[in-house]
């Protein structure tokens, strides 16, 4: 491939590790300036997961030991501080020291680990733990986040109680439902479990019927 892309990725990794990683408490700061000054030391799971995604894909492409080390540290930080052992799932936001700031549960912290890195790491490493974690998260999604019409909803309390008055739940996010349909079919391809295929195709059919404009070829953003 074009080595300039690898060099840019390496420069980004250098910056992330030098300025973005919290050496005292672990985890990635939400935001730093271009010069590396921390401007938001909280640890939103959205940020943690996509930092981890970058490390995972860089590791797959380069087998870089430093990236692999920070990938392990990132995943360990999230598992130790953000995973809810009682109810399952990741909480939304941590304080700098890893204590829970917001224990609500949103779509992205649950599903982004699958679409971001777990379903790429498993084919690359064949580590069954990655596939088992992906299946566990998908099972939680289907159990707690899918309504009786088959749609995936957005925000929940710590114990997975649906929050009907939350602004994120005022509509259905079409893109997120498309993501789940793809993830279900990807899990079927990796596991051979026909239940994933059945559920993925059912959600796909529902999306095509209610959210796709055949005349324009475009998807609605929400329902």
Language-model features: locations:
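Glycan-recognition and catalytic cores of secretory/periplasmic carbohydrate-active enzymes
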Residues: 1-223
